[in-house]
Amino acid sequence: MSIGKMLSPAAIGVAVAGLLAITPVRAQESIKIGLILPMTGGQASTGKQIDNAIKLYMQQNGDTVAGKKIEVILKDDGALPDNTKRLAQELIVNDKVSFIAGFGVTPAALAAAPLATQGKIPEIVMAAGTSIITERSPYIVRTSFTLAQSSTIIGEWAVKNGIKKVATLTSDYAPGNDALASFKEHFTAGGGEIVEEVKVPLANPDFAPFLQRMKDAKPDAMFVFVPAGQGGNFMKQYAERGLDKSGIKVIGPGDVMDDDLLNGMGDAALGAVTAHIYSAAHPSQINKDFVAAYKKAYGSRPGFMAVSGYDGIHLIYEALKKTGGKTDGDALIEAMKGMKWESPRGPISIDPETRDIVQNVYIRKVEKVDGELYNVEFQTFEAVKDSGKTKK
């Protein structure tokens, strides 16, 4: 029996109207974001912070942009670049994502870069901090930081503030090399001396034997870079070796004093001076609101990885608004270039030439505030670009 014989004209009219009402919803496809993060392993705190911040942003701002629903597909790469590449390919080919984002470590971001280029898919780097990353694909935009930004600043600050002899301890991979090179250049240019230089393995490092070498060198301070998540272990062994009682100060980029882990480090962290892009103690109202909302949602304070994820999803939302919800990769990248906004960390922008972030870098000192440890900012360097690129 045909449909016409089964239904009355009135019923057919209702059915057609129903189909017309449904059609626009079907045509309004969701925009998918492939979020690749280390949710397990030694970098898991990075993944957790970024994932939390993205969820918070979407709770606050909704899950619809330019009339299209935003769908985030989270994948755990364990900070292993082979996993990253496989997951990125699956997300692009099978899930048809319009963005890939996250990337807890530099090797992960680099592993995905050729796929971003081939697919013309924007790759939003929310964590990895090596300068070269944005040069590996015209489709990469970064909302985190570079190690050169903060390490350059702390090198200049140290030599101007009575620190003459420094021993360095850095993780032996690309960001650690960037941090070391930037610090050394600016510290020694001001007359400072490097009295000991140690590189430690990235995976599961035992800092104890290296810390003894630091202690024996008797520097004024130790310049330390270890990735987010390892700072707590480093400070534990620093205290066990008695370096906190020996007068050897800890200085460095802020990764070692991540707000997410700071309270667990104990009083050994007091007095550490670092240069970084964000502190949970940043005094702006927008940051106070961000910290309060994050604490309410997750029971802990946000760190610099959280704010980088928060700004990363904001960048995606704003780019989609500019394109009217269109997901052409070239149009999205053009929309992101030069974008400026007020972040919980302070004013930030995307350099239209390099697609890297331009932001304030703050000198902070670990102090106890209301019984908790915080990175308290006391000096600001405004609108800092990546020095690794400004030389070119």
Which sequence ranges carry the predicted segments?
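Bacterial N-terminal signal peptides
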Residues: 9-21
